[in-house]
Swiss-Prot record:
The keyword Glycoprotein does not apply. Its EC number is 5.3.1.23. This is Methylthioribose-1-phosphate isomerase. Signal peptide: none annotated. Pathway: Amino-acid biosynthesis; L-methionine biosynthesis via salvage pathway; L-methionine from S-methyl-5-thio-alpha-D-ribose 1-phosphate: step 1/6. It holds the Pfam family IF-2B. It is an enzyme of class 5 (isomerase). The lineage of its organism: Eukaryota, Fungi, Dikarya, Ascomycota, Saccharomycotina. InterPro entries: IF-2B-related (IPR000649), IF-M1Pi (IPR005251), IF_2B-like_C (IPR042529), Initiation_fac_2B_a/b/d (IPR011559), M1Pi_N (IPR027363), NagB/RpiA_transferase-like (IPR037171). The record marks C176 as: Transition state stabilizer. It catalyses: 5-(methylsulfanyl)-alpha-D-ribose 1-phosphate = 5-(methylsulfanyl)-D-ribulose 1-phosphate. GO terms for cellular component: cytoplasm; nucleus. GO terms for molecular function: S-methyl-5-thioribose-1-phosphate isomerase activity.
């Protein structure tokens, strides 16, 4: 794919013509293809298959799909769906990805709109307009909040480095994809990296330190880091080096050794910044599988060696679930075993991109455990960054107050 054809716009909603198209993230980074979403069922399939992913984006696509579904029903000669029919469809949509709370929150909000009507009542323009206004506001708020998250994360990074009296270049590790492709735009964890690089890269930083390099984890087994985060970093021209998930400890150890380097880079890792699909009342955070081990690695280096690495979780307030007390109560989605036993991608011949094929990489017929998420205990999290102006940090007793 030529660089001119690339885009970071994951969601296209035409407010005038009421159409929804999403960027098919299963074919990135080799192809830019948009898929038309014309119904709630289309959205369910796209979310379930991970053609769209990222907790905020899932909620936005779900909400817009509901709008499109109602609109098409009202315009159809045979359109006579009831409130009860819509409520049944909403519960079906909710089952597409159970771990991320944003979709559940959006569906609950829409359910509240429907509570004013009888279940037997036929869908009408008033219901449509209320849900249309809700969905567009959800998108607009998410985009504005992502920029706030970026600025708040930048502020926290600057304050942390100043408190430590750190000077010189530093690096950041991230996992999965938490950028424009996972949200309405800019991103959460990757949004912080964007904002930080814009203000703190070597040529513009007015501080005694600067962001030198980013290390995105490959993010097995679905490889969102390799496919999507590298796509965004390359698009934004932010310097990065891709690593496997199991290289993190070695990377940190190498970069803290003044006599060693990684392809000429020596800037130490000072921050690990991740997103979240659900943050519960006590601060436990569910995120892409592999996040928990990053926090554990950071804790080891912080406690066993003379290293200070801040572990930051970045997410909008819509990701915070105050109705769930601890991470033990979070339902963790388990993905199909084939995602672990096969690799899917196009055949590459030089610069030519061929047909997509599936390649086996494991012994046939074996048992596989493939949880999509893990839960990082709040005790391992240094800060939770949201659109709220002040970063959430633990009190003297090691507890978060997210209310």
């Amino acid at each position: 794919m030529s660089k001119e054809s690339r885009t970071l716009q994951a969601i296209k909603f035409d407010r005038q013509n009421v159409t929804l198209d999403i960027l098919d993230q299963l074919v990135l980074p080799y192809s830019t293809t948009y898929i038309s979403i014309k119904s709630i069922d289309d959205a369910y399939n796209a979310i379930k298959s991970m053609q769209v992913r990222g907790a905020p984006a899932i909620a936005i696509v779900g909400a817009f799909a509901i709008v499109v579904d109602i609109y098409n029903n009202l315009k159809s000669k045979d359109g006579n769906s009831s409130i009860g029919d819509l409520q049944t469809s909403l519960q079906h949509l909710l089952r597409s990805r159970p771990t991320a709370v944003n979709l559940a929150n959006a569906i609950n909000d829409i359910e509240q709109i429907l509570c004013s009507y009888e279940t037997s009542e036929v869908l009408n323009e008033s219901i449509y307009k209320q849900i249309f206004d809700y969905a567009t506001r959800l998108y607009d708020d998410d985009l504005a909040n992502n920029h706030k998250i970026g600025e708040n994360g930048l502020k926290y990074i600057v304050e942390s480095l100043k408190q430590e009296n750190f000077k010189g270049p530093f690096s950041i590790i991230t996992i999965c994809n938490t950028g424009s492709l996972a949200t309405s735009g800019h991103g959460t964890a990757l949004g912080i990296i964007r904002s930080t690089y814009a203000k703190l890269h070597k040529e513009v930083s007015g501080e005694d330190f600067f962001l030198d390099h980013v290390y995105p984890c490959e993010t097995r087994p679905y490889n969102q880091g390799a496919k999507l985060t590298t796509y965004e970093l390359d698009y934004e021209k932010i310097p990065f080096t891709l690593i496997c998930d199991n290289m993190v400890s070695s990377l940190i150890q190498t970069l803290k050794n003044e006599k060693k380097d990684v392809h000429g880079k020596t800037s130490p890792v000072k921050f690990i910044i991740v997103g979240a699909d659900r943050i519960v009342r006590n601060g436990d955070a569910a995120n892409k599988i592999g996040t928990f081990q990053l926090a554990t690695i950071a804790q080891y280096f912080n406690s066993a060696q003379d290293t200070k690495i801040k572990f930051i979780v970045a997410a909008p307030r819509t990701t915070i679930d105050l109705n769930t007390e601890t991470g033990d109560e979070i339902k963790i989605e388990e993905r199909p075993h084939k995602e672990l036993t096969t690799l899917v991608g196009p055949v590459l011949n030089g610069l030519e991109v061929g047909d997509k094929i599936t390649v086996g990489i494991a012994t046939p017929g074996i048992t596989v455990w493939n949880p999509a998420f893990d839960v990082t205990p709040h005790g391992l999290i240094d800060s939770i960054i949201t659109e709220d102006p002040i970063a959430y940090v633990k009190d003297k007793n090691g507890n978060y107050n997210l209310t």
